[in-house]
A protein has these predicted regions:
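Boundary/linker segments flanking structured domains
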Residues: 1-51, 59-65, 76-218
Length: 221
């Protein structure tokens, strides 16, 4: 049976696409969603200078993640000042911050490394982290890191951003495939969009026999 989850959201400037802080009931971690143009305004929030990890993202036309960068911060939103000067791609920052007891240096280092590895595995978007952290996650810390990442993944999903591996979410019920006319393709429909999966193939040397395409071709002669 699925477990219900309660979230509290504050829209700090009264706009649905403005600065938001999100807290899951009984969690020690707070999420801050910060549009880049509002970075200076976000610095005025209480608790936003705590340690944690963050995502810098840009979106495509469908409001899905197109590019992503993941980092750690020991002083909260102040870390974004460097990225505001040096990284041009991002439009929004999403920060996951907590107190020092929850997010020790080892914890945020392990969480950063884990999140970057998951982003590469997801194959959903371009990951801007050119160097993977060499931090080795202690086996005793891993269960807590996985638990925190699961919460991060859930919060991101509530904001419309899927972090999970695309192929791991597929099953026979929602996967479609075709092998006709030189095409070997697999895809999935999520209720809104149809996405062709990586590895699909099409033989471009085969002639198109579509009646519709032939009519279109004749109409432009």
């Amino acid at each position: 049976m699925a477990i219900s989850k309660k979230l509290e959201i504050i829209y700090h400037n009264g706009q649905p696409d403005g600065i938001r802080s999100i807290r899951r009931h009984l969690s020690t971690m707070t999420t801050y969603v910060i549009p880049r143009p509002l970075l200076s305004e976000a610095k005025k929030l209480s608790g936003i200078n705590r340690p944690g990890i963050y995502y810098l993202i840009s979106e495509d036309e469908d409001n899905k993640i197109a590019q992503i960068y993941i980092g750690q911060t020991r002083n909260g939103v102040v870390r974004l000042d460097d990225h505001n000067r040096t990284k041009g791609f991002w439009k929004k920052a999403i920060m996951f911050l907590a107190d020092n007891k929850t997010f020790s240096l080892d914890m945020i280092s392990g969480l950063e490394a884990y999140a970057i590895a998951k982003a590469h595995d997801a194959k959903r978007y371009k990951v801007e982290n050119s160097v993977n952290p060499k931090y080795e996650i202690d086996e005793y810390d891993l269960p807590l890191i996985e638990e925190v990442y699961e919460e991060i993944q859930f919060i991101m999903a509530t904001q419309g951003y899927k972090l999970d591996n695309l192929k791991s979410t597929l099953n026979e019920a929602n996967t479609l495939h075709t092998t006709r006319n030189g095409i070997l393709a697999f895809g999935v429909y999520d209720g809104e969009h149809f996405e062709v999966l990586e590895g699909s193939e099409i033989d471009m040397s085969r002639k198109c026999h579509s009646v519709t395409m032939e009519k279109i071709g004749r109409a432009h002669v």
